[in-house]
From Swiss-Prot:
Protein's name according to its UniProt entry: Uracil phosphoribosyltransferase
GO biological process, any: UMP salvage
Encoding gene per record: upp
Cofactors (names): Mg(2+)
Organism per entry: Dictyoglomus turgidum (strain DSM 6724 / Z-1310)
Activity regulation text: Allosterically activated by GTP.
Phylogenetic lineage: Bacteria, Pseudomonadati, Dictyoglomota, Dictyoglomia, Dictyoglomales
Amino acid sequence: MVIVVDHPLVQHKLTKLRDKSTEPKEFRELLSEISSLMLYEVTRNLPTKEVEVETPLGIAKGKVLNNKDLAIVPILRAGLVMAEGMLRILPSAKVGHIGLYRDPNTLKPVQYYTKLPEDIDKREVVVVDPMLATGGSAIAAISILKTKGVKNIKFVCIISAPEGIEALKNSHPDVDIYTAAIDEKLNDHGYIIPGLGDAGDRLFGTK
């Protein structure tokens, strides 16, 4: 399933994120804020349990998340800022890291780092990466998680291309995709058009 998060706040911040005049500091803040907002939709069906708490005036019944069962796995490096934004909402979630870069010649992902919680196979995992372009990095990261026994995976990005969505759905049809926008297409270099450029470079001021 593909879920487009079209909340007005998300779309407002996404428009500013796309603007080429947005500086790295503001770009990081916007990406973090959008990720926090998108997490509301991603966690809509998380299980809760009923509890009682004592207020200053009596006993109230309430519900709490069992978010100890959640893990956030950013694809390095651009996914880090998304994970930080989500952790502001769910600070008790565990975090893993998968390092992938896209070979500029083949456009295929190359793995260079993986560090995951020991109990990752018992957790619902949210994989985050700002851009779903060719789909190669997302497919590779999810494949790594599945080899570790993870069964419940969601993928969250800010901008996606139709080609990337199709590739990810074909490789991992059991994984729901959450995105703030589906753009027009990929160019010959594998970049999303109109997109926002290279998310990692814009985040960290590199070229």
